[in-house]
Amino acid sequence: MTLAILLSVATACRQNRSTATRNQDGLINIVTTIFPAYDFVRQIAGDRVNLTMLLSPGAESHSFEPSPRDIITIMSSDIFIYTGESEQWIERILLSMNTDEMTIFAMMNVVGLVRKEIVDEPCHECDDQDCAHDHGHEHSHDHGHGHGHGHSHGHGHAHGYGYAYGHAHSHGHEVHTCALFDEHVWTSPGNAILIVRAITELLSEADPNNAAFFQQNAAAYIKELQQLDAAFSEVVANAKRRTIVFADRFPFRHFVDAYSLTHYAAFTGCSTETEPSAGTVAFLINKIRTEQIPVVFHIELSNERMADAISAETGAKKRLLHSVHNVSRRDFEAGLGYLELMRRNVETLREALN
């Protein structure tokens, strides 16, 4: 469905939003675009909110397009949580809505941001030093320059908290950026803690009667996230190596920055490519062989073909490192969440680094 049609739906809804969107049960309506935010709210609020996730379990998040029903769902929300600037359709749709009674929150706005870049040349054409990141060209770091700018949509309540912009260094190679910051901010447990605290604040403001409940749950959940962070730190501190290889897209930029890991990947996190060049495959195979890397990673909901091929060629074990961007229908119905999936990553990373 075209954006123009979706915008017309949003415009039609502009005058139909009531000043109180709570259901008859008195619960506030929370809408999230993707699974991480959905799970964070679920852990904090339990059944004391009406919670909806727009992205269906098992669906590809990067190609998601909202339906008219999704637009109506967003309109009915008291709090709308999305990732950030990568979801460009949201900005345009929200501008067409009456957001006077909505609180709008972007997860990217509470963490230090790093730029991500798409490069045209495969990684095998650069030297080992410059190949330390996605395709060997992505040397971007958060330098902690905070700017307290929040985004406002219509007259809604926007929570920006603060931005911290990174600087991109191309090291002499021609690079072409996708003009976005890496949106996979939740892959760092430290970032997840910041996001959970911000969401808890929003929920407490929206529903003061349940604020103590939200804050108690958040405190317990944050303690578990801190333990998760410590577990990853322990794995890295005692590892034989600090290098991981991805035969897939790479959504773990915030994660590897948090634990000072070196990574080699077929595609950047925002890449729309699905088939790597022969040169990229050859480079990754050579890297695994020369450094005797025992594991080649793929991400969730991947076709795994490239990981299969590289595993067969090198003898490296194929393993899933779950970014928790989305979950399968089976995992969703089983109630698996961020903590469970990331705890699996702890042991998988231990295997890969030893």
Language-model regions: role of each:
Residues 1-8:
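Bacterial N-terminal signal peptides
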Residues 13-354:
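Extracytoplasmic metal-acquisition and chelation regions
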